[in-house]
């Protein structure tokens, strides 16, 4: 854990963190009965402290490569626009969940060969019992007015074969709220 950021953050500087995750992915992706049998594996990587951007980028690239060695298609949350740095992260052929334009430059990612799934928080996040996202999706508005190419503030991105579609996300940001 990275105590100054909360117990829910991995310490991206500790060798033990990498050893643990390597062992976990090895167990889940190999052997006679792997847990992850589908083609894709999501590595997470999102919403870390900006002061740690370079190490975050290193961690992200490390696990994109790690998952690829098992023949899996790695997925990740799009955070690299916000987590600026010099450490290269190769998104070519990787799938990013494009959840917020402030966190991911989607057009650039698509031009560089990333695949993307629109998971735009403004339209597609359900976070019950909070006042900053929806409790439910607006099905009628989505059916009548929305497009998978639509991001924040209704901005439409260019059509791309690497835009795979869209998905919604349900989060429980309030632990202990009975939901």
Where are these regions (language model features)?
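Short secondary-structure boundary/capping segments
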Residues: 1, 58-60, 131-135
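Active-site neighborhood of glycoside hydrolase catalytic domains
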Residues: 3-95, 99-114
């Amino acid at each position: 854990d990275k105590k100054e950021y909360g117990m829910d953050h991995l310490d991206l500087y500790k060798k033990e963190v990498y050893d643990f995750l390597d062992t976990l992915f090895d167990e889940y992706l190999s052997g006679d009965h792997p847990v992850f049998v589908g083609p894709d594996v999501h590595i997470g990587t999102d919403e870390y402290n900006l002061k740690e951007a370079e190490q975050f980028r290193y961690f992200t690239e490390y696990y994109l490569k790690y998952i690829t060695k098992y023949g899996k298609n790695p997925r990740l949350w799009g955070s690299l626009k916000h987590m600026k740095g010099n450490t290269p992260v190769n998104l070519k052929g990787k799938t990013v969940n494009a959840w917020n334009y402030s966190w991911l430059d989607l057009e650039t990612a698509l031009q560089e060969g990333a695949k993307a799934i629109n998971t735009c928080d403004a339209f597609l996040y359900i976070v019950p019992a909070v006042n900053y996202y929806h409790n439910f999706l607006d099905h009628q508005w989505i059916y009548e007015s929305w497009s998978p190419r639509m991001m924040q503030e209704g901005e439409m991105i260019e059509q791309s074969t690497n835009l795979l579609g869209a998905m919604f996300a349900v989060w429980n940001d309030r632990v202990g709220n009975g939901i």
